[in-house]
């Protein structure tokens, strides 16, 4: 009986234990889900806050930009009617007092007839003039007016060097053209000054690089030209030889390998002898001969050196005309092992006849004995 009573108790305990376990698991899952949802909500809130902050900054930037453009400067408040009426009255009075198209601009017309315009009692001509409250001493007014009157009456003198005429009809006409583009001869030298130079255009007597001006320079040029070369003309239009530029110099100053007879130096010849490889007899150097002796391998008797012989004694395969047969040499050229012309047959000597005779005699003796 006891066993039967314990069995349902054990089953009931196991069931309650399983239910408790399932409840704890469900509670854990619900807690996890709640934490995850809370974290996601927190992240979404932070993102929305960042977006809202960015939107606010964008709106602030747009507002500042609109303020720069003159918009949204604040609430637009209409002007009061009193202010508008005063402004209109001032404008109408000013328009009626001042003409629309004034004929002349005069300092005397600057006085305002009405007291309602806020105008100074007198104009300040200089910054150094002390400011006043409307009370001006009479000497100050007289001084200022006299200065302006003196300036208006003053005129430039036409004889002055800085005066070129204010009349537009005389501009670039008449004598003024000679200042800009002087002709040959042109004006006097006192008027052709450096102040008239423009864009590389100068008078004929103007200073250029290396060119002198005045009578002293002309006299020096003439002296140099006469001493150097009498063929050149002394004209004002042409440059003198002593003034030449661009690598050109007079005859006494020639460079680039050309010099006159009186300026010859080492290796330099006069103009009449400046042909390549040609030198006169007095300028011969080693290995150089005059034109009459400039044949290859030919030298005169007076210029023989070691190993060189005159025409009649040339060797190297060349003989005079009377001896131009191969293997023939004259008596005066015999050397060791060489014989005269009458003995120069290949393999033949002076004792050939004796040998022949001896051979013949020996042959005859043999035949006779036989």
Curated annotation (Swiss-Prot):
Transmembrane segments: none annotated. It comes from Aplysia californica (California sea hare). The modification Leucine amide is found at residues 60, 69, 199, 209, 246, 256, 266, 276, 286, 296, 306, 316, 326, 336, 346, 364. This is Myomodulin neuropeptides 1. Residues 210-226, 347-358 have a biased composition (Basic and acidic residues). The gene is MYOMOD1. Residues 28-40 have a biased composition (Low complexity). Residues 1-18 form the signal peptide. Keywords: Amidation, Cleavage on pair of basic residues, Neuropeptide, Repeat, Secreted, Signal. GO terms for cellular component: extracellular region. InterPro entries: FMRFamide-related_np.
